[in-house]
Amino acid sequence: MSIEIKNTGVKKVVLAYSGGLDTSAIIPWLKENYDNCEIIAFCADVGQGEEELVGLTEKALASGASECHIVDLKEEFVKEYIYPTIASGAIYEGTYLLGTSMARPIIAKAQVEVARKVGADALCHGCTGKGNDQVRFEGCFAALAPDLKVIAPWREWTMQSREDLLAYLAERDIKTSASATKIYSRDANAFHISHEGGELEDPWNEPSKGVWTLTADPEDAPNKPEYVSLEVEHGRITKVNGEALTPYAALMTLNAIAAPHGVGRIDITENRLVGMKSRGCYETPGGTVMFAALRAIEELVLDKTSRNWREQVAAQMAHLVYDGRWFTPLCKSLLAASESLAESVNGEVVVKLYKGQATAVKKRSPNSLYSEAFATFGEDQVYDQKHAEGFIRLYSLASRIRALNANDVKSK
């Protein structure tokens, strides 16, 4: 077929490429709409699974890319993004551990690095115009490479459905294994997998068993609990069941241990950055165990005011990460605050895994502020309970004065 090539001045584009239907169609579309430009496919390996990477280079080249760069980011992703975020206590809207959100800044950073390496003058992503990811990616691009043009095909082209994309590729004799019958939209990395679409678009529908792919149904999980030990240094998991592991290996080990117990499933309706609500089902087995372990150590080592400050840091971090503001001064400051608080977050936790639950049942720390001698409900010789009387009188002084003033007003 005869295709008119538009003149836009773009010479070389680095595309965030997954090998899926969308990005497979984007490659020829870019050539047709951006000066027959050179397309460099870039894929970030953030632990989505080896099966997702098999044949990826061949597929990209067959679609029209001149190169395909697959960059292994797994260890960096866990060490530099997941661990600091978990240590901060960040959890979006009280439930979501930010698995997708945390992956976007490292992917964007690596994409920019590839663009610099190959001398590209534009970046491209396959995010839709309805979702959060377009904002996350482009926010990171703005912070890291404000000089590079950003192309977002879903905001430009007229295609609206999988059927449109399949027809587009067929017209150009580009083969794809994708079909029009895909039910769910999924996004996976080392930390979690998300599921959207299909029956989940109606919040009155219970997720079918076919939604979940990583964890066992808690109803079918073992009837006997499993206990896992985690050792923590400065807010980082360093050992699992006594074995020293790298951050990535620790996460993979905990995923393998916790998933058969159905740990880490959530079904939420969240507030998207772009204003609408969306429903998603998430599976985060290992991350849920890590989160529980760190919070358990914090209960031992953080005093009341420090714990209050950590909660404020966590709330702000959750929104910054969700909103794609990783590369901002505020995020840097909050990470520094979290790092400071984590200096005393050291110790060992035993987490009980049973029927979808991860519960910290044992914890100890060399920095523990808990004293059995002071906290005991039995007879003790170290705490004079009479001392509490003066504290209570001072603590409640403002309330006492307010009440006295109110009585004076009534009596006049």
From Swiss-Prot:
GO terms for biological process: argininosuccinate metabolic process; L-arginine biosynthetic process; urea cycle. It catalyses: L-citrulline + L-aspartate + ATP = 2-(N(omega)-L-arginino)succinate + AMP + diphosphate + H(+). CDD domains: ASS. PROSITE patterns: ARGININOSUCCIN_SYN_1, ARGININOSUCCIN_SYN_2. L-aspartate binds at residues 128, 132-133. It is an enzyme of class 6 (ligase). L-citrulline binds at residues 96, 101, 132, 136, 185, 194, 270, 282. This is Argininosuccinate synthase. It comes from Shewanella baltica (strain OS155 / ATCC BAA-1091).
